Amino acid sequence: MWVEILVGSSAAIISGAAGYLLSKKIEKDKLKIYEEQARAKAKAIEHEAEKILQNAQVQVKEAELELKRDFEKKLEELKRDYEERFNELMEKEMSLKQMFKDELKHITLEKQEIKAEREEINRLKNEYEELKKRYQEKYQEVLEALQQQAGLTLEEAKNLILQKAEEESRLEIANIVRKYEEEAKREAKRRANYIIAQATTRFAGEFAAERLINTVSIPSEDIKGRIIGKEGRNIKTLEMLLGVDIIIDDTPNAIILSSFNLYRRAIATKVIELLVEDGRIQPSRIEEIYEKVKEEFDQQLLEEGENIVIDLGIGLIHPEIVKLIGRLKFRASYGQNALGHSLEVAHLAGIMAAEMGGDEVMAKRAGLLHDIGKALTHEYSGSHVDLGAEICKRYKEPDVVINAIYAHHGHEEPRSIEAAAVCAADTLSAARPGARREVLEAFLKRVQAIEEIALSKPGVKKAYAINAGREVRVIVNADLVNDNEAVLLAKEIAKDIETGVQYPGEIKVNVIRENRAIEYAR
């Protein structure tokens, strides 16, 4: 039994040893295979590296050759350019040398000519001195002989000759002057008649008479009561804001607005039309619509003025003056619309200036602006001439325009053809049959004078003459005029109107002082 165990153990040991040795041999064989594979890969890598290096060397050589070829090519081009430039400079140098030689030769010839001329001048000068000496000797001999024969001294003979020549010259000059004066007068009259005929036949103006009332149509009679408002609050607000007289009478479905100021009357008409259309007639709404309409009117005036300036082709004009041009539409003089009159004068003056050889565009510009001050006479005191000249000076209008403004009423003499043309055109436009009405203008001037007296007082914001000039409403600044001063102001204005304006009946002076306190609840 023990023998079997020993034999079995020995066999197991031998078997294990044989397996170990076999595994070692297998591992050794694998290691050898790996080493051979590694050597083969290393050799392949080395071969690839050598191949890459060879390719790189070839590329470097090709690049060197390319750079060398480019360098040689550029060098050749530079050399060729240099040679061309050098040849050009050489040619210029040769040309300049030749020019210098030619100029030097020319200067030498000129010097010779100058020398010869100087010698000739000296010779002639000597001859002149000799002749002068001989002439003086001869003159003295003749003079002495004449004095002996005439019994006069030299000075007496000179005076006698000069006196005779002066008398004859004066007579001849007087005849010539008289002749040309008569011809000039005839030609001037003929030319003036021709120019006026040309101007009047090439322009035909329209007559636009001024009215003092506007009628606003209303859908029903109950609107009249709403316009008046509770205790007359609405109509008082309207009249105070608009500066017109609102007449509500038995005329069916109509409200009459009366004012000599066309601008106020137009705004009032639009405001009442919008109020009637809106239906909300109350003081706050009245003020809101009034501000809106006034803003729209100002924009319309600017656009209308711009259109007129463009149509006349007179260049750029300051926007403030353009707005005043549009406002002339709502101003009249002796019943003649101021804007229509200014346009008429502009066209006539342009035609006349062109006929007389002046600047047609400048004459049109001066003609359009000659009465621009009339757009301001309702708001500021002073003549329309002074106001117009001041506004044009402020906005840098040309001197020709300012001179025309002063000259058309004789404040200055016209200093240019254009200013003279404006004066003549203004007279033509005003004198045209049917152009003006004197009675209406006298009334308008009286009403305007009443407003100007009120506006001239300190603290006065606005002044409106209403009721055909029988009442003036004066709105004062509550911060500058207190209640007691308002009473004194009314008396002072009334006294100035009595002394400064001629009027029938009596005029009511109504000074209004209103103080508002406004706050918002948020």
Curated annotation (Swiss-Prot):
Gene3D superfamilies: Hypothetical protein af1432, K Homology domain, type 1. One of its GO terms (cellular component) is plasma membrane. It comes from the Bacteria. It holds the Pfam family RNase_Y_N. One of its GO terms (molecular function) is RNA endonuclease activity. Keywords: Cell membrane, Endonuclease, Hydrolase, Membrane, Nuclease, RNA-binding, Transmembrane, Transmembrane helix. Its EC number is 3.1.-.-. The keyword Transmembrane applies. Residues 338-431 form the HD domain. It is an enzyme of class 3 (hydrolase). Endoribonuclease that initiates mRNA decay. This is Ribonuclease Y.
